[in-house]
Amino acid sequence: MPLITYRKALNDALAEEIIRDENVVIMGEEVAQYNGAYKVTEGLWQRFGDKRVVDTPISEAGFIGMGIGASMLGIRPVMELMFWSFAYVAWDQIINNAGQVRYMSGGLINCPIVIRGPANGGTNVGATHSHTPENFIANTPGLKVVCPATAYDAKGLMKTAIRDNDPVCVMENTLLYGESWEVPEEEYLIPLGVADIKREGSDVSLIAHGRAVITALKAAEILAAEHGINAEVLDLRSIRPLDEEAILKTVCKTHRAVLVDENKPFCGVSAQIAATIQEHAFDELDAPVQRVCSLDAPAIYSPALEPIQLPTPERVVAKALHIC
C-alpha cells in the first residue's frame, strides 16, 4: 500500500465524495483559491470549481448556519473550521439546529452535514486556538464525533461521515497532517462507533483517541522494551457513538486501564470512559483506572512550557507502572 499523509488522505476522501455525489460541497474560510489554511483542500477548487468548493466570510455562525440550512434541503456540506476553538461562535447553530432538527421535526428533517478541522494543542497558538471540544459536542444527543489518529482512519471515517444522514464532527490534529501511513488505493469505509486495536497486549490497556493514540503507542513500546510490560492500545476512533463493547473487552482482557486523552480531565472523554468501566467491568479490574490528560488549565502559549501540559509517553508509562 502507498504511504500518504494524513492531509492527503483527507483530501482524497473529499475529492472521491465530490465525484461520487453531486450534492457534496465544501465550504469554509479560504478553502478554495488558498487551498485551505492547512492545505487539506489543495487542488479541489481547481478540479471542481466554485460551485463545489466555496469560500465563505469570516463568520462561523454565518457559514455553519448556511451549511446546516443547506443540509436540511438535501445538500451534503463539508464545512471547514480553521480551529475547532471557533466552533463556539457557531454553538447555537451546531447544538440547537444541527443537533436537534431530526428530533424536533419528528424525524421528517435530517441534517447530513460534516464539520471538520483541527482540535488540538501543541502548536503554540494560545488558549483561544487550542480547544479540544469533543466532550462538549458528544454531550449533545444528535451529534456524532470522530477523532482519527492515522491517515487510514482519517480517510475511512471522513467518507463515512459525509455519507451519514446526521451531523458528524470530525476533529483532526494539525500535528498529524504531515505524518504518513499506509492507505489502500481501493475504496474503503470505516463505520462510526467501531474502535480499533492498534497494538495487541495482555498486561494493561491504553485507551486513547486522536493524537493521544500515537502517544499511547510510543508508551507501549517503552513499557515493552524497558519494563517487560505488554500493553494493548485501543484507538476509540469515534467518541459518539462510543464503542463501549471494545472498551470493556480490552479491560476484561488485561484487567488494568490507563486512559490517554488530550481533553481536559474535568468532565472530559476519559471521565466518561472511566465511568463506563466502573459501571460495567468493576469486578474485572485488578487496579484503579488511571488517566493521563492535558493539565486542567488554559492552553499554555509558551513553546517551552506547552509540551508539559499535554500527555506524553513518559506520563503514560508512569501511570502504567503504578498499576502493573
Task: Set out the residue ranges of the language-model regions.
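Thiamine diphosphate
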Residues: 1-171, 307-308, ...
